[in-house]
Amino acid sequence: AVQFPDGGSITIIAVTTLSGGDITHAVPDNTGYITEGQLYLRRDSNVGKVIIDPFRSLSRLKQLVIGKKTREDHPQVMNAAVRLFSDAAGAQTKMENGFDLTDYDERTLSFAADYSRELLAIDVNIDTEQMLDTAWSLFGKYFRPAEVNIKQQLVDKYWPKA
């Protein structure tokens, strides 16, 4: 990356494709690049879109920005959304293995579909404020405040009004 004295920068974005989606392929495993972050894209068959996979993506710089240069609720919303998305992955596994799903499982699956479609899909183009507002809207649609596990002062301020 290059940063110019009068402002602006150029960042090199390397793209690695995996033959047949095989993440164990030797070429990407042996590149050895140290990056400031990576976005792992995959097709979400439940919504038919390519999404940013939050479990395999990483950012070494987010802690410098999130909640400091973004809205106060950003860290808690991010953590809650990823946790609920993870709960949905567990519910998906239960369903695939023939186990009964609880009401909570059903709601996490519905949440995950909307979360993928409205926030993780690569064709989504919204700013951070809209992203946070959308996440709160999804929380309110599928969960009770206690299930989301976000500080009460943030729930009081941002939870969607009925």
Please annotate each region the language model reported:
Residues A1-A162:
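P-loop NTPase catalytic core
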